[in-house]
Design a protein with these regions (language model features):
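Glycan-processing catalytic domains of CAZymes
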Residues: 60-464
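Membrane-proximal basic amphipathic "stem/tether" segments
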Residues: 1-81, 92
Length: 464
């Protein structure tokens, strides 16, 4: 009898799905109907796969609840009591990692201080925090706003902030920051934190630059819509740019690959001729005594062989360019204005278990989470179901894959998006919800991957 009921349910479910998909309604209208059905007919539809997925999404996937963590010596908890949720990982004590299997480099956003241009475009006192603080949930189970932990709503012009960032990064196994560098035909924006970092030799964490060579627009996406400040790409600008940043390339802390300073470009396809730009930069650096440079680009909008641009490598930049599964119809909007898109973050874990071997030099990238509601409000892009445990698995897989593909330690790089992209919910810095869980997951991933690599190296049959 039970089998008969289950078969009947399955048949009804399949038929209902077919009718549902054929309804001539817009997605928002269909979502309202589905929400009403789930709310009013729970006893009838509670067994359905759609309803079960909804419940799972609302409950979240935080696997760190109840876990114990060990963290580096010399740090003390600074999260106020009573402000963190039950999944918050405290800051305990443990020895710092040695002999790390790969170098982890975090993208670093410098927009946490005021500049005249932002004051004019967005209002007096604007920083990244201006968008982060008022962010609100857009659907059931949506976590907003994101509230910082021990570092607070910091100002990057405060030297103590960068010192603490460096301490945290080093203690949890991060090998370097990749600063976004904003250059518009000789006009530099948001460069005060980078200048301060360069001038303060006590900040001993290695660093490199990524030229964010897009236009700035009011949409926060680099597209040509209501441009605030535009790029001025030309041969003269190529030379002016490399001349200016040479002061960073010369610094002893600057990240190098086989002795070559590492320079990233966010979108080389926006250059009139990326190959010609690369040639100019390489020639200029040779003639000025810097020597050879290592050029890489982020796969933010494209996935092509870097040699097409005259570059040496590409860097994965999730969640961009990832074609994840869309689960927008599985969430329950909290207001009628919600027109965003929701994706399932867990797809990255699954894909990382069996990476495709690239045909060119590619550095893996991971992101702890992603949600740009702070910038786009009801038109945001949200990746649901991220968790510290899931991030740990993804990062571990990325490190293991990197060690298999690169024998030279200099090329064993994994990029993390990001250290402090708070308006995109992509950060490792401690917050009130998870505490130090993402930082601790980073350290655990390094430790787990080191053990995996050692085991495979000791067993020749596992080598590829």
């Amino acid at each position: 009898m039970r089998c008969t009921c289950q078969s009947l349910r399955k048949s009804v479910y399949i038929r209902a799905q077919s009718i549902w998909h054929s309804l001539p309604l817009r997605s928002q209208a269909k979502q309202k109907v589905k929400n009403a059905v789930f709310r009013l007919l729970i006893s009838t539809v509670g067994w359905s796969p759609d309803y079960q997925r909804r419940q799972k999404a609302d409950a979240g996937t935080d696997s760190f609840r109840g876990m114990e963590f060990e963290t580096p010596t010399g740090l003390v908890p600074a999260i106020p009591e009573g402000t963190a949720d039950k999944s918050c990982a405290p800051l305990l004590q443990a020895e710092a990692l040695k002999n790390k299997p790969a170098k982890l480099i975090c993208f670093y956003l410098p927009q946490f201080h005021t500049i005249p241009e932002n004051n004019a475009w967005w209002g007096d006192g604007f920083t990244e925090w201006t968008n982060v603080k008022p962010a609100r949930p857009q659907f059931a189970g949506h976590h907003q706003p994101h509230v910082p932990g021990e570092l607070g709503y910091y100002n990057l012009c405060d030297p103590a902030v960068q010192r603490r960032q460096v301490e945290l990064a080093k203690c949890f196994g991060i090998e370097g920051f990749c600063f976004y560098f904003y250059w518009f035909g000789g006009k530099r924006l948001l460069d005060a934190p980078i200048e301060n970092y360069l001038n303060d030799r006590s900040l001993d964490l290695p660093f490199c630059l990524c030229w964010a060579n897009e236009n700035w627009s009011r949409r926060w996406d680099g597209l040509d819509s209501d441009i605030l400040i535009a790029q001025k790409h030309c041969p003269e600008d190529d030379l002016a740019f490399i001349s200016w940043i040479s002061r960073y390339l010369d610094d002893r802390r600057y990240i190098r690959i086989k002795g070559k300073p590492l320079l990233l470009v966010y979108r080389p396809n926006l250059l009139p001729s990326a190959k010609e730009t690369a040639t100019r930069w390489r020639r200029w650096c040779r003639e000025r005594g810097i020597g050879e440079i290592f050029l890489a680009y982020t796969q933010s909008f494209e996935k092509v062989d870097p040699t097409r641009y005259g570059f040496d490598a590409a860097v994965e930049f999730p969640p961009n360019n990832s074609a994840p599964p869309d689960i927008t119809d599985q969430v329950e909007p909290l207001n009628n204005r919600f027109a965003g898109r929701v994706f399932d973050w867990r797809v990255f874990i699954e894909r990382s278990r069996c990476y495709r071997k690239p045909s060119y030099k590619l550095f893996r990238g991971v992101c702890p989470s992603w949600d740009n509601t702070a910038r786009r409000q009801h038109r945001s892009v949200v990746f649901l179901n991220s968790s510290p445990q899931g991030y740990l698995q993804w990062l571990s897989n990325a490190i293991t894959d990197t060690c298999k593909r690169f024998s030279d330690p200099d090329e064993r790089l994994v990029f993390i998006n990001a250290w402090n992209e708070w308006a995109e919910s992509a950060y490792l810095e401690p917050d009130l919800r998870h505490g130090y869980a993402y930082l601790e997951a980073t350290r655990l991933a390094l430790a787990a991957s080191a053990l995996t690599v050692q085991t495979e190296q000791s067993n020749p049959t596992n080598r590829q």
